């Protein structure tokens, strides 16, 4: 979220996708993510187009968010039976980016849950680059090797253009 805010402060149009059911990125951006709003959940399950979920941050007119809602917590179970489940977010973003509002976006940042399920796989398939923000402590570093292995698997099978930034 801090990187998104900094980019927007320097004049870039930034979209944050809050793919974490806890919704902390939405909260940090001042976006309501309670109740019956259209959210990234609706995009992932295929009931809403991505552009319809975007909310402008009150902090900066160049900063937008596709918020999380509690519905996202059940999305992993719903995705299991869906066709092309790993590509749902990617396909929605491709449609958005080829439209006039999407063409104006400079950066899309996806905030992922701290798990390696289908929501995170959707993010990796949709992304061009992965950045792993972690604290330099033992428990935080413990899961990085598994995360890097999963990124390599996604790169090998689903998104060959995916890079891991340093």
Predicted features and spans:
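P-loop NTP-binding core
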Residues: 1-166
